[in-house]
Amino acid sequence: IQPPKNLLFSSLLFSSLLFSSAAQAASEDRRSPYYVQADLAYAAERITHDYPQATGANNTSTVSDYFRNIRAHSIHPRVSVGYDFGGWRIAADYASYRKWNNNKYSVNTKELENKHNNKKDLKTENQENGTFHAASSLGLSAIYDFKLKGKFKPYIGARVAYGHVRHSID
C-alpha cells in the first residue's frame, strides 16, 4: 500500500547537556570560533495526517482510525557543527532516529440477539501492522549563552529542523 503524501511529522526535542561542555570548552580557549558538538537528544514524536473521515453512507475511509494519532518516544544521537560569535552561537545539525513499530490486535464482540437460549453475536477481529520510521532530521540552531561568573553557563536556544519520515502498512 502506498502511503499518502500528506504526512505531518512533528517532533519536540530536548537536548541533553551530556556533551555540551565539549563545545563550551572549545569556544572558551579562543583557539577557533568553530566547534563540533555531540548530543544525546530525547524526542517525543507525534505523527498525524489529513486522511478523510469516513462520513456518510457512500464515503468510506481507507485508513483505520488507529493510524490517525501515533506517538513514540526515543533517545537518539545528534551531531552539530557551529560557529561561536562570543555571546551567541549558530549550528547546523544532523540527528538519526531509531526505527519503531506499531502493531495492534483488537476483538470487538456485540450481542445481536438472544431468544430462547439462542444467542447471536457479531465478532470482529482486526489486525493492524504498521512500521513508522522517523529516519533523520537536519536542523539549524541559534543559541544565546548567558554570561555568569563561575563554571556553570546556562543557555537558551531555538531549533528549526526538517524531518524525514518513512512508513508502511503491512
Curated annotation (Swiss-Prot):
Location in the cell reads:
Cell outer membrane
Under the heading InterPro entries, the entry gives: OMP/PagP_b-brl, Porin_opacity
Q: Which SUPFAM superfamilies match?
A: OMPA-like
Q: What GO molecular function annotation could you give as one example from this UniProt entry?
A: porin activity
**Location (main, coarse):** membrane
Q: GO cellular component terms?
A: cell outer membrane
**Highest taxon above the source species:** Bacteria
Q: Which UniProt keywords apply?
A: Cell outer membrane, Membrane, Transmembrane, Transmembrane beta strand
Sequence similarity: Belongs to the opacity porin family.
Q: What is the recorded name of this protein?
A: Opacity-related protein POPM3
